[in-house]
Amino acid sequence: MKTKHTIPIILSAFLLSCTGKTNGQSQQSVEKTLTVEQAATAKKQRLAPPPGYKKVKLTEGTFGSFLRNLPLKPVGSDLHYYNGSIKRRNYTGAVVDIDFGHGEVEQCADAVIYLRALWLWQTKQYDKIHFNFTNGFRADYTRWAKGERIHIDKKTWRCWYSKDTAADYSYKTFRKYLNLVFTYAGTASLEKELTTITGKELQVGDVIINGGHPGHTVIVVDKAVNKKGEAVYLLAQGYTPAQEIEIFNQWFSINPQIKYLDTPDWYFRGNYAKRF
């Protein structure tokens, strides 16, 4: 497995970055193929909120709306690791059909970074696309798009910019910028960039994170409430080994003031609720 670089922290730490709750606790594979009728029913029911709950209204064009409307692979699609091997057959949640999860360094924090950065790039909010490496160096997309490139001395881990090429705001160049961020950022650095949520409710786009080595993170991609005002949330994640982005097939009741949250692959503790 290719090692993600944490600067100047031990480089191999990211091999443990999202490897919680294993030892047989992962969702079991469903070894069957859905019929056309079953697939149609499953598509209608997939990701539907629990009885008595309705999805909250989201303004078109917002980050929340972007996350709610992520393109999904067909019902019953397999969930794949970055190398093409199958993690879960006929995944009962949803597999996001997006340009992520095909590179070895595209892990849990990177999934959150990618979704946030992609929305900002699509809405041309280029100046807001910036992420820190683990040593605190700020990688600015605007400088990258203008032709500057980031250089790293791997003996001292000093980073600097230099003007190396012409300006280019294309997706190809944007993706190359993200590949570098994925290599040198992680849950430890991402957590420091986010604001702690002090209230009792989350918004779509909020992040659940325990930064560290190991660490893990998931992102809120939808929200529903009942007549009592009680909220439930839909969560998505990347993982280690790198994989496609998955949306869990369950809604979570989350109160950030309760300092413990159990998800299928990770127990979050402390001030885990954050916001961009």
What role is predicted for each listed range?
Residues 211-212, 237-239:
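Conserved "cap/hinge" positions at secondary-structure junctions
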Residues 168-228:
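...with weaker cross-activation on analogous glycine-rich loops/strands in unrelated enzymes
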Residues 238-276:
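Low-complexity, Gly/Ser/Thr/Pro-rich intrinsically disordered linker/tail segments
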Residues 23-99, 106:
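Cationic-aromatic interfacial patches
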Residues 2-10:
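Sec-dependent signal peptide recognition
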Residues 16-17:
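C-terminal motif of bacterial Sec signal peptides marking the signal peptidase cleavage site
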Residues 226-237:
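Short, solvent-exposed secondary-structure boundary/capping segments
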Residues 97, 102-195:
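Extracellular-facing segments of soluble proteins and assemblies that are Gly/Ser/Thr-biased and enriched
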